[in-house]
């Protein structure tokens, strides 16, 4: 073989080796997985969530949920020698800049800085999210009526001025203001809740205070990731059996670990699917801990009745 051919052959071999080495490194990159963040915001800490996956042989992509809004796609995650970087455009932010994420991975922890769309820098710590796998079927305890139609003794409010009251056996939120939250916390459970929303209404039922089952007047359109029945931004309902504004709807929700089944108005719209992570508006990112049921009241009027929870015997706190 001539020198020219030999040189080209060696160059090609080196290129293939470099590509293969790069692909192998990314396939085993410790950034891959799901991460629960606590971000030290200007006013107070808030939760966020990150997922990084391998696309093809060497490209890292992902999803990110900020303190509010829904999970956003990340077209490319840069990762080299323990350092991670990506940028995503704004979602609900008033500013127009990209949000920039920079961090350093050390084992099951990431420490770093988020630069917001407005240019503010916020430190964060992320921990690898727990799997929440269950090794046996739950043994259900006794049903507990969370709302008795008379008072709100099992509930507290947070996040603004409370407009919640009991009217003719119904828990009503007259206008946008505070959210309402159970005083008790739960791990695995079955939840029955009846709700009614006005035209253009928007609310939600947060499971363990972290995963929002969306309530919305969506006009009966084909389901999307942020419409009625969705786990907000993460799980898509397979149909939309809405009764429309002004009518009573029912949710029957079973949550075991990360696996959720949602029955809306008698139709199973999400069947034993895995919730990847927290949704926008979550109370915290401590996914392994028990959490409350919280009902969203900050978006506007909404009504609830007949709220009954059946906790797993080992799941109630």
Regions found by a protein language model. Give the residues of each.
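Carbohydrate-interacting regions of secretory-pathway proteins
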Residues: 30, 34-317
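Bacterial N-terminal signal peptides that target proteins for export
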Residues: 1-11
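Bacterial N-terminal signal peptides
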Residues: 9-21
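Boundary at the C-terminal end of the N-terminal hydrophobic targeting segment
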Residues: 23-27
